[in-house]
């Protein structure tokens, strides 16, 4: 079968780690006899440079026509004063594709537990997923206004928006440890009261999955105190933005973690959680793990190529266990050498 993928390398370290990700994809294609048609297009600052737009029309069309999209990283000081910033392109892409669910898996490999800011006995065996709603809440609610004397943001959610994101969380939990933690502020916010009610309704349709509710402040504390207690966390846009970034710090490096954004229909977007890191761009020292893991996540969630995704994950784990660690993990392995070892492990693995 042929899979059509749009590659958006972006800015900063994006092109370097995208090269790593695509090399891994090519290795999988060769080993398991798949065909991946890859189209590369400018996006973010690179889009501004060539078309004065962070998401040129040709890039958007390629994304809409793809089976899945890989994104490296966007942004940098070069475009801080541009009429349209690189980040505007990502918001536009999410809207155009109808991406409503951001999925961020949080795992701490045993080879790097010492890098976590948490004690080893707290962080060991951490394995949970944050499911964040992307289309509603304070970021998009109207009215939205500010001037020198006052400002207003609106936290708005519809039943349909809440129900589909909570259903997505239960769908994911069904493939894991069958527990969903719904995070809200139902003791204060009207939107959270509706959120909690709908969560209970969805849970009633999934009797084999446990639902618990936590207020956002309690969830933020528990994530640090006992991260292993979580399986799938689901929450609204602002809370999800904060919690997913808090969760990412548990691993000790942003260079480790992938994410996925899903629509109800159409292609999904896979990307590392970190930024473009312009300070280390073009030095061959960026950690490509988050991009490699994004490729694995794409194979698993968009194409149901589970064996192939497992092969990538196992190869990356063996690479780190063998001592191939980039600078952010306390080592001195280059981007190229890390990638080459992963490729070697894929080729020689089961």
From Swiss-Prot:
Recorded GO CC terms: cytosol
Q: How is the cofactor bound?
A: Binds 1 Mg(2+) or Mn(2+) ion per subunit.
Binding of substrate occurs at: 94, 104, 132, 217
Please state the Enzyme Commission number of this protein: 1.1.1.85
Which sites bind Mg(2+)?
217, 241, 245
Which reaction equation describes what this protein catalyses?
(2R,3S)-3-isopropylmalate + NAD(+) = 4-methyl-2-oxopentanoate + CO2 + NADH
State a single Pfam family of this protein.
Iso_dh
Residues with site note (Important for catalysis): 139, 185
Give cofactor(s), names only: Mg(2+); Mn(2+)
Gene Ontology BP, a term: L-leucine biosynthetic process
What subcellular locations does the record give? Answer: Cytoplasm
Q: What does this protein do?
A: Catalyzes the oxidation of 3-carboxy-2-hydroxy-4-methylpentanoate (3-isopropylmalate) to 3-carboxy-4-methyl-2-oxopentanoate. The product decarboxylates to 4-methyl-2 oxopentanoate.
- Which family does the record assign? Belongs to the isocitrate and isopropylmalate dehydrogenases family. LeuB type 1 subfamily.
Q: Fetch the NCBIfam families from UniProt.
A: leuB
What is this protein called in UniProt?
A: 3-isopropylmalate dehydrogenase
Q: Which organism is it from?
A: Listeria monocytogenes serovar 1/2a (strain ATCC BAA-679 / EGD-e)
> What taxonomic classification does the UniProt entry list for its organism?
Bacteria, Bacillati, Bacillota, Bacilli, Bacillales
């Amino acid at each position: 079968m042929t899979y059509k993928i749009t590659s958006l390398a972006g800015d900063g370290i994006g092109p370097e780690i995208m090269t790593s990700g695509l090399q891994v994809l090519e290795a999988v294609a060769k080993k398991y006899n798949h065909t991946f048609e890859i189209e590369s297009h400018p996006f973010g600052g690179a889009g501004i440079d060539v078309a004065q737009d962070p998401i040129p029309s040709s890039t958007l069309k390629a994304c809409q026509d793809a089976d899945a999209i890989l994104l490296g990283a966007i942004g940098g000081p070069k475009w801080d004063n541009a009429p349209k910033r690189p980040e505007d392109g990502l918001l536009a892409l999410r809207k155009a594709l109808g991406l409503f669910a951001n999925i961020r898996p949080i795992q701490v490999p045993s080879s790097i537990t010492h890098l976590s800011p948490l004690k080893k006995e707290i962080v060991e065996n951490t394995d949970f997923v944050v499911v964040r709603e992307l289309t509603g809440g304070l970021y998009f609610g109207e009215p939205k206004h500010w001037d020198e004397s006052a400002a207003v943001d609106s936290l708005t959610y519809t039943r349909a928006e809440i129900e589909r994101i909570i259903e997505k969380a239960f769908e994911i939990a069904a493939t894991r440890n069958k527990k969903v933690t719904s995070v809200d502020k139902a003791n204060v916010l009207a939107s959270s009261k509706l959120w909690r009610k709908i969560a209970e309704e969805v849970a009633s349709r999934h009797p084999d999955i446990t639902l618990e509710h936590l207020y956002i402040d309690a969830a933020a504390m528990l994530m640090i105190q006992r991260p292993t207690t979580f399986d799938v966390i689901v929450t609204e846009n602002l809370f999800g933005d904060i919690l997913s970034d808090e969760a990412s710090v548990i691993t000790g490096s942003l260079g480790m973690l992938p994410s996925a954004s899903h629509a109800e229909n159409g292609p999904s977007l896979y990307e590392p959680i970190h930024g473009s890191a312009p300070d280390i761009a073009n030095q061959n020292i960026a950690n490509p793990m988050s991009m490699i893991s994004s490729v694995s996540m794409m194979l698993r969630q968009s194409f149901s190529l589970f064996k192939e995704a497992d092969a990538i994950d196992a190869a990356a784990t063996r690479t780190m266990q063998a001592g191939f660690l980039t600078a952010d993990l306390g080592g001195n392995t280059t981007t190229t050498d890390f990638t080459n070892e992963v490729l070697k492990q894929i080729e020689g693995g089961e």
